[in-house]
Each structure stands twice: as C-alpha cells, then as structure tokens.
C-alpha cells in the first residue's frame, strides 16, 4: 500500500518527490497544470529522470496526476467541450512522457441537460481522445453528486465505461469523502460499499483512492473535506477502510485541508492504523 498526499510540482518532479519523502509518503498526487486554467508548464526531461531514480531508490508506488478543474467533458456548450477535450488529450501525452501511469478526471457536470445526456457527452469526448497505446490510464473519479455532477452513483460511472471503445485504458478513483456525501455509508460498512462497487463496476477497475474525512453528513451531496478524524466519518471508520484488502497495492492520497505538517502527521497515523 502506497500512502501520500496532493503536492505541487511547481518546482519540478524531483522537488515534489523530495517533499513527499519529507512527509513519509511513498506516492503523491499533483495537478497536470494550474487547476483553475492556464497553459501547462513545459516538462524537463532531466528533472523527470532524476525523479524516477529517486522514486525507485525509495520504493515509491505509482504517481497519480489530476486533471484541472476547468475541464468539463459533459459540457453542452461546444467551446467548453472542445477545451476539455484538447486539454485532456494534451495532458495524457505529457503524463506519458513523465511516466505517470494514472490521471484522475472528474467526469463533468451536465449543466441541466440531464444525467443521460451528460454521460453521452462524456463517452463521446473520451472516445475521441483515448487510444489503446496511450500509456496513461484515465481514472474517472466518483463524485458526491452535488448539483449537476455526473458520477455520484456507481451506475453512472459504469454507463460511461460501457460506452467506451477502449475501456481498457479507463479505471476509477474513489474518494472516501465523496462516497459519504453521495450516500455510500463508508462509516458503518465500507466492505458493503466495495461489494456494491464490485458488483456494478468491478474491483479490477479501482486503481487509486483519495482518503479524506467529511465535514458534511452522509448523503448530503456536498464535497467538504476534513482532516482525518476531525470529520463525520471518523478515525475508527477510516482505519477500517485502510485495512480493506481491496486497497492493498493501491496509491492512497490525502486531499485534506491542511498544511505539509498535517500531511506528515496524517500519513504517520494511516501507517500506524495498518494491520497488514
């Protein structure tokens, strides 16, 4: 099991790996570019090579990229949709160059056109972008179901995957806070939640997870992360979650609202909670 947090690569991949090491991490997540928009930073091959060497030296697991929030693959507006496709396609190429195997993508928001229309739009966009030899697996993130978000139910993620021409390059990233907000009771019975995921989507598609507590109650459809043990999921439930055998070998990253010192403390707590 690889434990980490969301870090910045603004100073390069090598710097981010060293920061990860300083907090006891063996993986990390990062944005492919400014999360609110803007041009992508040019990649430095030497920096990438040094970061790969460091990761191998310290037994890192796979890194996880995260697409910017500005892309909406479900957008009904052509200009917005075209921007999302262009950005995602470019970032897949960039992450393949950086040898980052996973990229998390929010499915998108249907903006009032309805879930089915949103799913159709997402699958159409992905079918235009995805290639069997792209070298990066796109991970659809399970959402909390806020507003017009697509992906708040496992069935919605399954419908997207079912519409793909190359489904083998698509997986899923779950988030403990999003699951709780969407109405999946990770506090009382995470095993039952994963059983439902396996039945509807298949555990073989679960490639990464975000570990967050929640400020909002079960089924609130609100995405408000909390520090581990300081939210409504709680330490006991999160410890049980971390010890589920389906998570062994996966990169698990924090997205909690803290500073680097909080990440260091939370990673130490997660490691101490592991029984295997």
From Swiss-Prot:
Keywords: DNA damage, DNA repair, Endonuclease, Hydrolase, Metal-binding, Nuclease, Zinc. It catalyses: Endonucleolytic cleavage to 5'-phosphooligonucleotide end-products. Belongs to the AP endonuclease 2 family. Its EC number is 3.1.21.2. The gene is nfo. GO terms for molecular function: deoxyribonuclease IV (phage-T4-induced) activity; DNA binding; DNA-(apurinic or apyrimidinic site) endonuclease activity; phosphoric diester hydrolase activity; zinc ion binding. Zn(2+) 2 binds at residues 141, 175, 210, 255. Pfam families: AP_endonuc_2. Binds 3 Zn(2+) ions. PANTHER family: APURINIC-APYRIMIDINIC ENDONUCLEASE, ENDONUCLEASE IV ENDODEOXYRIBONUCLEASE IV. It comes from Heliobacterium modesticaldum (strain ATCC 51547 / Ice1). Endonuclease IV plays a role in DNA repair. It cleaves phosphodiester bonds at apurinic or apyrimidinic (AP) sites, generating a 3'-hydroxyl group and a 5'-terminal sugar phosphate. This is Probable endonuclease 4.
């Amino acid at each position: 099991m690889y434990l980490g947090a969301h870090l910045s690569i603004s100073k390069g991949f090598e710097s981010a790996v060293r920061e990860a090491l300083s907090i006891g991490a063996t993986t990390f997540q990062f944005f492919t570019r400014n999360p609110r928009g803007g041009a992508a930073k040019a990649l430095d091959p030497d920096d990438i090579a040094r970061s790969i060497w460091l990761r191998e030296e310290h037994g890192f697991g796979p890194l996880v990229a995260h697409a910017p929030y500005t892309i909406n693959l479900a957008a009904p507006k052509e200009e917005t949709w075209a921007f999302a496709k262009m950005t995602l396609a470019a970032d897949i190429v960039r992450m393949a160059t950086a040898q980052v195997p996973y990229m998390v993508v929010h499915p998108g928001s249907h903006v009032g056109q309805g879930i089915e229309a949103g799913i159709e739009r997402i699958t159409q966009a992905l079918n235009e972008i995805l290639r069997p030899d792209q070298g990066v697996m796109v991970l659809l993130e399970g959402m909390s179901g806020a507003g017009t978000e697509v992906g708040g139910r496992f069935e919605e993620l399954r419908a997207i995957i079912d519409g793909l021409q190359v489904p083998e390059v698509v997986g899923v990233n779950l988030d403990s806070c999003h699951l709780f907000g969407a109405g999946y009771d990770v506090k009382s019975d995470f095993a039952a939640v994963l059983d439902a995921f396996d039945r509807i989507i298949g555990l073989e598609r679960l490639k990464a997870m975000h570990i967050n507590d929640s400020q909002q109650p079960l089924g609130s459809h609100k995405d408000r992360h909390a520090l581990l043990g300081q939210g409504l999921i709680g330490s006991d439930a999160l410890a049980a979650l971390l010890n589920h055998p389906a998570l062994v070998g996966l990169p698990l990253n924090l997205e909690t609202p803290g500073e680097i010192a909080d990440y260091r403390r939370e990673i130490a707590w997660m490691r101490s909670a592991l029984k295997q």
